[in-house]
Design a protein with these regions (language model features):
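Substrate-binding pocket helix/loop in short-chain dehydrogenase/reductase
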Residues: 92-94, 101-103
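Conserved glycine-rich Rossmann-like NAD(P)H-binding loop of the short-chain dehydrogenase/reductase
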Residues: 26-42
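Residue(s) in the substrate-gating loop at a strand-loop-helix junction
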Residues: 137
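Conserved glycine-rich cofactor-binding loop
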Residues: 12-13
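C-terminal helical subdomain
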Residues: 170-172, 176-177, 182-184, 193-226
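The beta1-alpha1 cofactor-binding region of Rossmann-like NAD(H)/NADP(H)-dependent oxidoreductases
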Residues: 55-66, 99
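Active-site helix of classical SDR
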Residues: 117, 153
Length: 226
């Protein structure tokens, strides 16, 4: 993919933050968004290649479209879009999850992904090749008690990705990405301190970027494990 420009959602912490640093270290231009401006400023100070970060609520389509336009103005059209931003519900049996919390999980994980695709896909159609990566989970193909909203949202991402793959022009591809079990704030919200025994985001990012850099048209519509 050339030029090497990646756009990642949810870069203020966790996997998105680690991916941004790893891609930069490999010579990529990095664009990214999150809600926390101070975290974006700090991340930008850690990168050496051209980059562009903006505070964006990915559940707001107008904000995402504006962001996509400014990414292209500053760095050009990304050849790789990574829909990483995600949210998990607080551990609770399904009937005790509030309507607001249930909807918020879907708004971020599913609608936010749709908004990013809606904003960037038309612009990527002019590329010689491009890839859209939608973050799934082990819970996108399995289930667990007390995280039903999150499981449902990731099953939705799996279906969305496979359907999108059938619609894309021949120069574009999409995959669902299962990152495995990584020690992030999200995992700690479920597992508590036990999450600390799992791989750290910065270590995961090294082999995850290896995976992402080697994706090809033959992967279109599949779920890959990084």
């Amino acid at each position: 993919m050339n030029p090497k420009t990646v756009c990642i959602s949810g870069v203020s912490k966790g996997l998105g933050h680690a991916l941004s640093i790893e891609f930069d270290q490999r010579g990529w231009q990095v664009a990214g968004c999150a809600r926390t401006t101070s975290a974006l400023v700090k991340l930008g100070s850690q990168l050496s290649n051209p980059h562009f970060f903006q505070s964006v609520d990915i559940t707001n389509l107008k904000e995402v479209i504006t962001f996509s336009e400014e990414v292209i103005e500053n760095l050009g059209t990304p050849t790789l879009v990574v829909n990483n931003a995600g949210k998990i519900n607080s551990n609770a049996r399904l009937h005790k999850v509030s309507e607001d919390e249930f909807l918020e999980v879907f708004k971020v994980n599913v609608c936010g992904t749709h908004n990013m695709i809606k904003a960037f896909l038309p612009k990527m159609e002019g590329l010689s090749q491009g890839m859209i990566v939608n973050f799934s989970s082990y819970w996108g193909q399995s289930t667990a008690a007390e995280v039903a909203p999150y499981c449902a949202s990731k099953w939705a991402i799996e279906g969305l990705t496979r359907a999108l793959a059938q619609e894309l022009p021949s120069n574009l591809s999409t995959v669902a990405l299962n990152p495995g079990v990584i020690d992030t704030d999200m995992l700690r919200s479920c597992f508590g301190d036990a999450a600390g025994s799992h791989e750290k985001p910065e270590d995961w990012a090294k082999h995850a970027v290896d995976c992402l850099e080697n994706l090809s048209k033959s992967d279109n519509g599949t779920t890959v494990i990084a």
